[in-house]
């Protein structure tokens, strides 16, 4: 039985590799992606944000209601962004359900993501995003453990170790870049599954501002 199961597993694995070899890898040329201004930085690159927020922004772009792109930010040290760069950050969302009593599958190539940046291996590029004039929104889903104040976090770290630390330093750099211009402020859209996520994130940022002496 074990030999048979191993043989079947091997056959499945081989078939999967053959299928992957035959599949066309998406890229910006194949998806027909248009160049749009960067309006969103998104902390977190998981399925929920890509299948929900980024998907809706893609539709808004198509309808001419947003005209903006997203840069994904990897806020944690482990893992990599290879699978995103392999496809130029283009991917497919598949919706399956019933329409008027009939089963229906809708596949959509999402083109709203322009790039993906690693805060640890691409720190300068990450901080450079704060200098983008068209930037307007910050979306985050760093899990329920992401929004936390840590008084051992350091401004001098590149990057700071916590998500609020990374965000605070990012916002401070933007503040300095645009010399305090209030019109260059950013709208925060945290979707972490904790009560009062926006209030808690603001509290962490304000505590870090005080800890690091960034206020007036």
Residue ranges of predicted features:
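Non-transmembrane, aqueous-exposed alpha-helical and coiled segments at domain scale
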Residues: 19-216
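Residue-identity detector for glycine
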Residues: 10-13
